[in-house]
Protein backbone atom coordinates (compact mmCIF):
# COMPACT_ATOMS: atom_id res chain seq x y z
CA UNK A 1 0.00 0.00 0.00
CA UNK A 2 2.86 2.38 0.68
CA UNK A 3 3.99 1.97 -2.92
CA UNK A 4 0.69 3.44 -4.12
CA UNK A 5 1.69 6.88 -2.83
CA UNK A 6 5.08 6.98 -4.51
CA UNK A 7 5.31 9.94 -6.89
CA UNK A 8 2.75 12.03 -5.05
CA UNK A 9 3.58 15.65 -4.25
CA UNK A 10 3.13 16.41 -0.58
CA UNK A 11 3.73 19.25 1.86
CA UNK A 12 5.12 18.35 5.29
CA UNK A 13 5.01 20.82 8.19
CA UNK A 14 7.62 20.00 10.83
CA UNK A 15 6.84 22.88 13.17
CA UNK A 16 8.51 26.24 13.71
CA UNK A 17 11.96 24.77 14.26
CA UNK A 18 12.27 22.71 11.05
CA UNK A 19 9.81 24.54 8.82
CA UNK A 20 7.76 23.32 5.85
CA UNK A 21 9.03 20.96 3.15
CA UNK A 22 7.45 20.17 -0.22
CA UNK A 23 8.51 17.49 -2.65
CA UNK A 24 7.66 14.27 -4.42
CA UNK A 25 7.38 11.07 -2.35
CA UNK A 26 10.20 8.70 -3.20
CA UNK A 27 9.95 6.17 -0.34
CA UNK A 28 7.58 5.26 2.54
CA UNK A 29 8.82 2.89 5.26
CA UNK A 30 6.03 1.60 7.51
CA UNK A 31 8.42 -0.24 9.79
CA UNK A 32 10.65 2.68 10.70
CA UNK A 33 7.80 5.18 10.24
CA UNK A 34 9.74 7.41 7.76
CA UNK A 35 8.90 9.13 4.51
CA UNK A 36 11.41 10.41 1.92
CA UNK A 37 10.98 13.31 -0.54
CA UNK A 38 13.01 13.88 -3.69
CA UNK A 39 13.85 17.34 -5.14
CA UNK A 40 12.61 18.93 -1.91
CA UNK A 41 11.84 22.61 -1.25
CA UNK A 42 12.38 24.06 2.20
CA UNK A 43 10.18 27.08 2.97
CA UNK A 44 9.82 27.76 -0.76
CA UNK A 45 13.57 27.50 -1.50
CA UNK A 46 15.03 24.54 -3.34
CA UNK A 47 17.22 22.39 -1.12
CA UNK A 48 20.81 21.67 -2.02
CA UNK A 49 20.39 17.95 -1.27
CA UNK A 50 18.49 15.76 -3.75
CA UNK A 51 16.48 13.85 -1.07
CA UNK A 52 15.38 14.30 2.53
CA UNK A 53 13.81 11.77 5.00
CA UNK A 54 11.41 12.57 7.87
CA UNK A 55 10.45 10.58 10.96
CA UNK A 56 6.83 10.40 12.03
CA UNK A 57 7.63 12.08 15.34
CA UNK A 58 8.94 15.20 13.58
CA UNK A 59 5.89 15.67 11.34
CA UNK A 60 3.18 18.01 12.60
CA UNK A 61 1.05 18.23 9.46
CA UNK A 62 1.09 16.50 6.06
CA UNK A 63 -0.80 17.67 2.95
CA UNK A 64 -1.23 15.67 -0.23
CA UNK A 65 -0.97 18.23 -2.99
CA UNK A 66 -0.99 16.04 -6.09
CA UNK A 67 -1.63 12.36 -6.81
CA UNK A 68 -0.37 11.08 -10.16
CA UNK A 69 -2.84 9.07 -12.23
CA UNK A 70 -2.48 6.62 -15.11
CA UNK A 71 -3.60 9.20 -17.71
CA UNK A 72 -1.54 12.02 -16.39
CA UNK A 73 -1.25 14.14 -13.27
CA UNK A 74 -4.61 14.75 -11.53
CA UNK A 75 -4.90 18.01 -9.57
CA UNK A 76 -6.83 17.86 -6.34
CA UNK A 77 -8.04 20.58 -4.04
CA UNK A 78 -6.11 22.19 -1.23
CA UNK A 79 -7.72 20.04 1.44
CA UNK A 80 -5.86 16.77 1.58
CA UNK A 81 -4.76 16.61 5.17
CA UNK A 82 -2.80 14.06 7.15
CA UNK A 83 -1.50 14.12 10.66
CA UNK A 84 1.34 11.91 11.82
CA UNK A 85 1.69 11.51 15.52
CA UNK A 86 4.21 9.71 17.60
CA UNK A 87 1.95 6.65 17.77
CA UNK A 88 0.98 6.30 14.14
CA UNK A 89 0.22 7.76 10.78
CA UNK A 90 -3.31 8.81 9.83
CA UNK A 91 -4.88 10.43 6.77
CA UNK A 92 -8.23 12.10 6.20
CA UNK A 93 -9.30 13.60 2.89
CA UNK A 94 -12.27 15.93 2.52
CA UNK A 95 -13.59 19.21 1.20
CA UNK A 96 -15.38 21.79 3.29
CA UNK A 97 -18.99 22.58 2.59
CA UNK A 98 -18.42 26.21 1.69
CA UNK A 99 -16.31 25.18 -1.31
CA UNK A 100 -13.24 27.19 -0.32
CA UNK A 101 -11.06 24.18 0.13
CA UNK A 102 -9.90 24.92 3.67
CA UNK A 103 -7.93 22.41 5.69
CA UNK A 104 -9.73 20.46 8.41
CA UNK A 105 -7.58 19.12 11.25
CA UNK A 106 -8.60 16.11 13.34
CA UNK A 107 -6.57 14.33 15.93
CA UNK A 108 -5.24 10.92 15.09
CA UNK A 109 -6.11 7.70 16.83
CA UNK A 110 -4.34 6.95 20.06
CA UNK A 111 -3.85 3.35 19.07
CA UNK A 112 -0.27 2.21 19.16
CA UNK A 113 -0.67 0.21 15.98
CA UNK A 114 0.30 2.14 12.85
CA UNK A 115 -2.58 2.93 10.53
CA UNK A 116 -2.12 2.54 6.81
CA UNK A 117 -2.62 5.37 4.40
CA UNK A 118 -5.68 4.64 2.22
CA UNK A 119 -5.16 3.65 -1.34
CA UNK A 120 -5.40 6.23 -4.02
CA UNK A 121 -8.18 4.12 -5.64
CA UNK A 122 -10.34 4.80 -2.59
CA UNK A 123 -9.77 8.47 -2.99
CA UNK A 124 -10.68 8.27 -6.66
CA UNK A 125 -13.93 6.43 -5.88
CA UNK A 126 -15.19 9.22 -3.66
CA UNK A 127 -17.77 11.45 -5.24
CA UNK A 128 -16.71 14.99 -4.60
CA UNK A 129 -18.80 17.85 -5.94
CA UNK A 130 -16.52 20.71 -6.99
CA UNK A 131 -17.95 24.06 -7.96
CA UNK A 132 -16.48 26.24 -10.77
CA UNK A 133 -15.01 28.50 -8.10
CA UNK A 134 -13.28 25.50 -6.60
CA UNK A 135 -11.89 24.57 -9.99
CA UNK A 136 -10.35 28.03 -10.36
CA UNK A 137 -8.78 27.81 -6.92
CA UNK A 138 -7.80 24.17 -7.19
CA UNK A 139 -4.14 24.77 -7.98
CA UNK A 140 -1.99 23.85 -5.05
CA UNK A 141 0.94 25.76 -3.60
CA UNK A 142 3.53 23.46 -5.14
CA UNK A 143 1.87 23.80 -8.58
CA UNK A 144 2.04 27.55 -8.40
CA UNK A 145 5.60 27.40 -7.12
CA UNK A 146 6.64 25.01 -9.86
CA UNK A 147 5.06 27.27 -12.48
CA UNK A 148 6.84 30.34 -11.13
CA UNK A 149 10.10 28.39 -11.06
CA UNK A 150 9.61 27.28 -14.66
CA UNK A 151 8.83 30.86 -15.64
CA UNK A 152 12.01 32.11 -14.00
CA UNK A 153 13.98 29.40 -15.77
CA UNK A 154 12.44 30.30 -19.08
CA UNK A 155 13.31 33.93 -18.37
CA UNK A 156 16.94 32.95 -18.10
CA UNK A 157 16.73 31.26 -21.44
CA UNK A 158 17.41 33.10 -24.65
CA UNK A 159 14.47 35.31 -25.64
CA UNK A 160 14.82 34.60 -29.34
CA UNK A 161 13.94 30.95 -28.80
CA UNK A 162 10.80 29.98 -30.71
CA UNK A 163 9.99 27.25 -28.24
CA UNK A 164 9.71 29.70 -25.31
CA UNK A 165 7.69 32.42 -27.00
CA UNK A 166 5.42 31.30 -29.82
CA UNK A 167 4.21 27.79 -29.11
CA UNK A 168 1.53 26.67 -26.69
CA UNK A 169 2.80 25.54 -23.26
CA UNK A 170 1.44 22.03 -23.75
CA UNK A 171 2.49 21.80 -27.38
CA UNK A 172 5.50 19.70 -28.13
CA UNK A 173 8.49 21.28 -29.79
CA UNK A 174 8.52 20.43 -33.51
CA UNK A 175 11.43 18.28 -34.42
CA UNK A 176 13.83 19.46 -37.04
CA UNK A 177 14.69 17.05 -39.79
CA UNK A 178 18.21 15.91 -40.23
CA UNK A 179 21.02 14.69 -38.04
CA UNK A 180 22.64 18.10 -37.83
CA UNK A 181 19.55 19.66 -36.29
CA UNK A 182 19.50 17.02 -33.61
CA UNK A 183 23.14 17.64 -32.84
CA UNK A 184 22.46 21.36 -32.58
CA UNK A 185 19.58 20.69 -30.17
CA UNK A 186 21.82 18.57 -27.95
CA UNK A 187 24.44 21.31 -27.92
CA UNK A 188 21.81 23.89 -27.02
CA UNK A 189 20.58 21.74 -24.15
CA UNK A 190 24.11 21.33 -22.86
CA UNK A 191 24.76 25.07 -23.05
CA UNK A 192 21.46 26.55 -21.95
CA UNK A 193 20.02 23.70 -19.88
CA UNK A 194 18.95 24.35 -16.30
CA UNK A 195 19.74 20.92 -14.82
CA UNK A 196 21.76 22.42 -11.99
CA UNK A 197 21.25 20.55 -8.76
CA UNK A 198 23.25 22.82 -6.44
CA UNK A 199 23.18 26.60 -6.74
CA UNK A 200 25.31 28.48 -4.18
CA UNK A 201 23.33 31.00 -2.13
CA UNK A 202 26.27 33.33 -1.37
CA UNK A 203 28.57 35.14 -3.81
CA UNK A 204 32.29 34.53 -3.91
CA UNK A 205 34.16 36.89 -1.55
CA UNK A 206 36.98 38.23 -3.70
CA UNK A 207 38.24 40.76 -1.16
CA UNK A 208 38.32 38.26 1.65
CA UNK A 209 40.24 35.71 -0.39
CA UNK A 210 42.63 38.39 -1.64
CA UNK A 211 43.39 39.43 1.92
CA UNK A 212 44.41 35.85 2.69
CA UNK A 213 47.15 36.03 0.03
CA UNK A 214 50.43 37.32 1.46
CA UNK A 215 52.17 38.80 -1.57
CA UNK A 216 55.28 39.92 0.28
CA UNK A 217 55.94 36.43 1.64
CA UNK A 218 55.44 34.84 -1.78
CA UNK A 219 57.79 37.29 -3.50
CA UNK A 220 60.37 36.82 -0.76
CA UNK A 221 60.17 33.06 -1.20
CA UNK A 222 60.57 33.41 -4.97
CA UNK A 223 63.54 35.75 -4.53
CA UNK A 224 65.21 33.39 -2.05
CA UNK A 225 64.76 30.44 -4.41
CA UNK A 226 66.17 32.37 -7.36
CA UNK A 227 69.18 33.56 -5.39
CA UNK A 228 69.94 30.02 -4.29
CA UNK A 229 69.53 28.59 -7.78
CA UNK A 230 71.57 31.36 -9.37
CA UNK A 231 68.79 32.56 -11.67
CA UNK A 232 68.16 36.23 -12.35
CA UNK A 233 66.08 37.83 -9.61
CA UNK A 234 62.97 39.72 -10.55
CA UNK A 235 63.08 41.75 -7.35
CA UNK A 236 60.83 42.05 -4.35
CA UNK A 237 58.18 44.69 -3.69
CA UNK A 238 60.46 46.81 -1.47
CA UNK A 239 63.19 46.98 -4.10
CA UNK A 240 63.14 49.77 -6.69
CA UNK A 241 65.41 48.88 -9.61
CA UNK A 242 67.35 51.64 -11.25
CA UNK A 243 65.53 52.96 -14.28
CA UNK A 244 66.99 55.08 -17.02
CA UNK A 245 65.32 57.38 -19.49
CA UNK A 246 65.53 56.68 -23.21
CA UNK A 247 67.97 59.60 -23.59
CA UNK A 248 70.07 58.83 -20.50
CA UNK A 249 73.42 57.12 -20.66
CA UNK A 250 73.61 53.98 -18.55
CA UNK A 251 77.39 54.29 -18.26
CA UNK A 252 78.75 56.13 -15.26
CA UNK A 253 79.79 59.67 -16.12
CA UNK A 254 82.24 62.03 -14.49
CA UNK A 255 81.16 64.06 -11.48
CA UNK A 256 79.02 67.04 -12.42
CA UNK A 257 80.75 70.42 -12.21
CA UNK A 258 78.20 73.09 -11.41
CA UNK A 259 80.59 76.06 -11.40
CA UNK A 260 81.60 76.28 -15.05
CA UNK A 261 81.74 80.06 -15.32
CA UNK A 262 84.37 82.04 -13.42
CA UNK A 263 85.06 85.77 -13.58
CA UNK A 264 88.39 87.46 -12.76
CA UNK A 265 87.02 89.91 -10.18
CA UNK A 266 85.07 89.44 -7.02
CA UNK A 267 81.47 88.48 -7.57
CA UNK A 268 78.90 90.58 -5.77
CA UNK A 269 75.99 88.27 -6.63
CA UNK A 270 75.54 84.78 -8.04
CA UNK A 271 72.65 83.07 -9.76
CA UNK A 272 71.87 79.46 -10.64
CA UNK A 273 69.90 77.80 -13.43
CA UNK A 274 67.14 75.19 -13.16
CA UNK A 275 69.76 72.44 -13.58
CA UNK A 276 71.92 73.86 -10.76
CA UNK A 277 74.67 75.53 -12.82
CA UNK A 278 76.15 78.61 -11.17
CA UNK A 279 76.09 81.84 -13.21
CA UNK A 280 78.05 84.71 -11.62
CA UNK A 281 77.15 88.34 -12.20
CA UNK A 282 79.52 90.88 -13.76
CA UNK A 283 79.86 94.61 -13.32
CA UNK A 284 78.64 97.09 -15.90
CA UNK A 285 82.25 97.84 -16.97
CA UNK A 286 83.00 94.13 -17.54
CA UNK A 287 79.79 93.70 -19.49
CA UNK A 288 80.55 96.76 -21.64
CA UNK A 289 84.07 95.47 -22.33
CA UNK A 290 82.68 92.04 -23.32
CA UNK A 291 80.31 93.60 -25.87
CA UNK A 292 83.10 95.81 -27.24
CA UNK A 293 85.45 92.85 -27.82
CA UNK A 294 82.63 90.85 -29.43
CA UNK A 295 81.88 93.76 -31.77
CA UNK A 296 85.56 93.92 -32.71
CA UNK A 297 85.45 90.23 -33.72
CA UNK A 298 82.37 90.68 -35.93
CA UNK A 299 79.37 90.63 -33.60
CA UNK A 300 78.25 94.06 -34.75
CA UNK A 301 75.63 96.23 -33.13
CA UNK A 302 73.08 95.31 -35.81
CA UNK A 303 73.57 91.60 -35.10
CA UNK A 304 73.30 92.16 -31.38
CA UNK A 305 70.13 94.18 -31.80
CA UNK A 306 68.61 91.43 -33.93
CA UNK A 307 69.49 88.67 -31.46
CA UNK A 308 68.21 90.72 -28.55
CA UNK A 309 64.97 91.47 -30.38
CA UNK A 310 64.38 87.80 -31.23
CA UNK A 311 65.07 86.54 -27.68
CA UNK A 312 63.01 89.31 -26.07
CA UNK A 313 60.08 88.72 -28.43
CA UNK A 314 60.16 84.98 -27.73
CA UNK A 315 60.00 85.63 -24.01
CA UNK A 316 57.22 88.20 -24.47
CA UNK A 317 55.16 85.79 -26.59
CA UNK A 318 55.49 83.18 -23.86
CA UNK A 319 54.38 85.68 -21.22
CA UNK A 320 51.37 86.63 -23.34
CA UNK A 321 50.11 83.04 -23.30
CA UNK A 322 52.00 81.33 -26.10
CA UNK A 323 49.94 79.03 -28.35
CA UNK A 324 46.92 79.21 -26.05
CA UNK A 325 46.51 82.92 -26.75
CA UNK A 326 48.04 83.28 -30.20
CA UNK A 327 46.01 80.96 -32.40
CA UNK A 328 43.52 81.44 -35.27
CA UNK A 329 40.56 81.02 -32.90
CA UNK A 330 41.57 84.13 -30.92
CA UNK A 331 42.03 86.57 -33.79
CA UNK A 332 39.41 88.84 -32.21
CA UNK A 333 41.48 88.96 -28.98
CA UNK A 334 44.85 90.12 -30.21
CA UNK A 335 47.18 90.89 -27.30
CA UNK A 336 48.30 94.50 -26.89
CA UNK A 337 51.87 95.43 -25.92
CA UNK A 338 53.08 98.94 -25.04
CA UNK A 339 56.79 99.67 -25.76
CA UNK A 340 58.46 102.50 -23.82
CA UNK A 341 61.79 103.28 -25.52
CA UNK A 342 64.42 105.97 -24.95
CA UNK A 343 66.69 107.62 -27.56
CA UNK A 344 69.64 105.24 -27.04
CA UNK A 345 70.88 101.75 -27.93
CA UNK A 346 68.69 100.08 -25.32
CA UNK A 347 65.72 101.81 -26.90
CA UNK A 348 66.78 100.38 -30.27
CA UNK A 349 66.71 96.91 -28.69
CA UNK A 350 63.11 97.51 -27.67
CA UNK A 351 62.15 98.68 -31.17
CA UNK A 352 63.65 95.47 -32.61
CA UNK A 353 61.58 93.43 -30.14
CA UNK A 354 58.44 95.35 -31.12
CA UNK A 355 59.02 94.61 -34.79
CA UNK A 356 59.18 90.85 -34.15
CA UNK A 357 56.07 91.01 -31.97
CA UNK A 358 54.16 92.86 -34.69
CA UNK A 359 55.21 90.18 -37.17
CA UNK A 360 53.53 87.62 -34.88
CA UNK A 361 50.15 89.36 -35.01
CA UNK A 362 50.57 91.27 -31.75
CA UNK A 363 49.17 94.79 -31.53
CA UNK A 364 52.23 96.93 -30.65
CA UNK A 365 52.14 100.57 -29.53
CA UNK A 366 55.63 102.13 -29.55
CA UNK A 367 56.33 105.26 -27.50
CA UNK A 368 59.47 107.17 -28.50
CA UNK A 369 59.91 110.89 -27.74
CA UNK A 370 60.76 113.30 -30.54
CA UNK A 371 64.40 114.32 -30.85
CA UNK A 372 66.08 116.46 -33.46
CA UNK A 373 68.88 113.99 -33.97
CA UNK A 374 68.55 110.22 -33.51
CA UNK A 375 71.14 107.47 -33.40
CA UNK A 376 71.67 105.57 -36.63
CA UNK A 377 70.66 102.30 -34.98
CA UNK A 378 67.36 103.83 -33.86
CA UNK A 379 66.71 105.28 -37.31
CA UNK A 380 67.29 101.91 -38.96
CA UNK A 381 65.04 100.09 -36.48
CA UNK A 382 62.29 102.69 -36.89
CA UNK A 383 62.46 102.30 -40.66
CA UNK A 384 61.84 98.55 -40.32
CA UNK A 385 59.17 99.00 -37.64
CA UNK A 386 57.21 101.39 -39.87
CA UNK A 387 56.71 98.54 -42.37
CA UNK A 388 54.70 96.56 -39.82
CA UNK A 389 51.20 97.11 -38.50
CA UNK A 390 52.60 98.54 -35.26
CA UNK A 391 51.70 102.03 -34.09
CA UNK A 392 54.30 104.66 -33.12
CA UNK A 393 53.40 107.55 -30.81
CA UNK A 394 55.49 110.39 -29.36
CA UNK A 395 53.01 111.72 -26.81
CA UNK A 396 51.84 109.95 -23.70
CA UNK A 397 48.31 111.13 -24.41
CA UNK A 398 48.19 108.70 -27.32
CA UNK A 399 48.91 105.70 -25.09
CA UNK A 400 45.87 103.59 -24.14
CA UNK A 401 44.14 104.48 -20.92
CA UNK A 402 42.93 100.93 -20.31
CA UNK A 403 45.37 98.27 -19.08
CA UNK A 404 47.33 96.50 -21.80
CA UNK A 405 48.54 92.90 -21.76
CA UNK A 406 52.24 93.71 -21.34
CA UNK A 407 54.52 96.75 -20.94
CA UNK A 408 58.12 96.49 -22.20
CA UNK A 409 60.46 98.99 -20.57
CA UNK A 410 63.52 100.23 -22.48
CA UNK A 411 63.72 103.77 -21.05
CA UNK A 412 66.80 103.49 -18.83
CA UNK A 413 70.43 103.68 -19.90
CA UNK A 414 73.39 104.06 -17.50
CA UNK A 415 75.17 106.38 -19.95
CA UNK A 416 72.23 108.78 -20.20
CA UNK A 417 71.27 109.35 -16.60
CA UNK A 418 70.22 112.92 -17.32
CA UNK A 419 67.17 111.64 -19.23
CA UNK A 420 65.49 110.77 -15.92
CA UNK A 421 64.96 114.46 -15.27
CA UNK A 422 63.07 114.98 -18.52
CA UNK A 423 59.29 115.57 -18.28
CA UNK A 424 58.49 112.85 -20.84
CA UNK A 425 60.53 110.31 -18.82
CA UNK A 426 58.69 111.09 -15.58
CA UNK A 427 55.34 111.02 -17.38
CA UNK A 428 56.15 107.64 -18.97
CA UNK A 429 57.16 106.19 -15.58
CA UNK A 430 53.95 107.49 -14.03
CA UNK A 431 51.85 105.99 -16.84
CA UNK A 432 53.53 102.59 -16.49
CA UNK A 433 53.06 102.53 -12.72
CA UNK A 434 49.40 103.53 -13.01
CA UNK A 435 48.71 100.92 -15.68
CA UNK A 436 47.97 97.52 -14.19
CA UNK A 437 49.84 95.56 -16.83
CA UNK A 438 52.96 93.53 -15.91
CA UNK A 439 56.31 95.02 -16.95
CA UNK A 440 59.21 93.35 -18.77
CA UNK A 441 62.54 95.23 -18.69
CA UNK A 442 65.12 94.51 -21.41
CA UNK A 443 68.76 94.84 -20.32
CA UNK A 444 68.00 97.03 -17.28
CA UNK A 445 70.86 98.93 -15.62
CA UNK A 446 71.88 98.71 -11.97
CA UNK A 447 70.42 101.63 -10.05
CA UNK A 448 72.22 102.90 -7.01
CA UNK A 449 68.94 104.41 -5.87
CA UNK A 450 65.92 102.35 -6.78
CA UNK A 451 63.56 104.46 -8.81
CA UNK A 452 61.67 104.31 -12.08
CA UNK A 453 59.49 101.39 -13.15
CA UNK A 454 59.32 98.24 -11.05
CA UNK A 455 59.49 95.26 -13.36
CA UNK A 456 58.04 91.81 -12.92
CA UNK A 457 60.61 90.25 -15.27
CA UNK A 458 64.04 91.40 -16.46
CA UNK A 459 66.03 90.05 -19.40
CA UNK A 460 69.85 90.18 -19.19
CA UNK A 461 72.20 89.77 -22.17
CA UNK A 462 75.10 87.27 -22.13
CA UNK A 463 75.86 87.52 -18.41
CA UNK A 464 73.65 89.12 -15.74
CA UNK A 465 74.34 92.30 -13.84
CA UNK A 466 73.93 92.35 -10.02
CA UNK A 467 70.32 93.46 -10.23
CA UNK A 468 68.23 94.19 -7.17
CA UNK A 469 64.73 93.24 -6.17
CA UNK A 470 63.20 95.96 -8.34
CA UNK A 471 64.21 93.92 -11.40
CA UNK A 472 61.78 91.12 -10.52
CA UNK A 473 62.52 87.66 -11.81
CA UNK A 474 65.67 87.59 -13.91
CA UNK A 475 66.08 85.77 -17.23
CA UNK A 476 69.24 85.38 -19.30
CA UNK A 477 69.39 85.29 -23.12
CA UNK A 478 72.12 84.11 -25.47
CA UNK A 479 73.10 86.83 -27.96
CA UNK A 480 75.72 84.71 -29.73
CA UNK A 481 79.01 85.71 -28.05
CA UNK A 482 81.69 83.04 -28.82
CA UNK A 483 83.52 81.27 -26.00
CA UNK A 484 86.94 82.64 -26.94
CA UNK A 485 85.61 86.19 -26.65
CA UNK A 486 84.79 85.44 -23.00
CA UNK A 487 88.27 84.05 -22.50
CA UNK A 488 89.80 87.16 -24.05
CA UNK A 489 88.26 89.34 -21.35
CA UNK A 490 89.36 86.90 -18.62
CA UNK A 491 86.10 84.98 -18.15
CA UNK A 492 86.21 81.17 -18.10
CA UNK A 493 82.91 80.44 -19.81
CA UNK A 494 80.84 77.35 -20.54
CA UNK A 495 77.35 77.84 -21.96
CA UNK A 496 74.57 77.33 -19.38
CA UNK A 497 71.77 77.55 -21.97
CA UNK A 498 71.59 73.94 -23.09
CA UNK A 499 68.89 73.66 -25.79
CA UNK A 500 67.32 77.07 -25.08
CA UNK A 501 68.12 80.68 -25.90
CA UNK A 502 66.34 82.13 -22.84
CA UNK A 503 66.67 80.56 -19.38
CA UNK A 504 65.46 81.65 -15.93
CA UNK A 505 67.95 82.51 -13.18
CA UNK A 506 67.48 82.04 -9.46
CA UNK A 507 69.28 83.73 -6.61
CA UNK A 508 71.97 81.41 -5.26
Swiss-Prot record:
The modification Phosphoserine is found at residues 131, 138, 140, 161. InterPro entries: DFDF, FDF_dom, Lsm14-like_N, Lsm16_N, Sm, YjeF_N_dom, YjeF_N_dom_sf. Residues 95-192 are annotated as: Disordered. GO terms for cellular component: P-body. Residues 283-487 form the YjeF N-terminal domain. Gene3D superfamilies: 2.30.30.100, YjeF N-terminal domain. Its main location: cytoplasm. CDD domains: LSm16_N. GO terms for biological process: deadenylation-independent decapping of nuclear-transcribed mRNA; P-body assembly. Keywords: Cytoplasm, Phosphoprotein, RNA-binding. Residues 191-296 are annotated as: Required for interaction with DDX6. Residues 1-79 are annotated as: Required for P-body targeting and interaction with DCP1A. SMART domains: FDF, LSM14. It comes from the Eukaryota. Residues 1-68 form the Sm domain. Residues 192-228 form the DFDF domain. Binds single-stranded RNA. Involved in the process of mRNA degradation and in the positive regulation of mRNA decapping. PANTHER family: ENHANCER OF MRNA-DECAPPING PROTEIN 3. Homodimer (via YjeF N-terminal domain). Forms a complex with DCP1A, DCP2, DDX6 and EDC4/HEDLS, within this complex directly interacts with DCP1A and DDX6. Interacts with ZFP36. This is Enhancer of mRNA-decapping protein 3. It comes from Macaca fascicularis. The gene is EDC3.
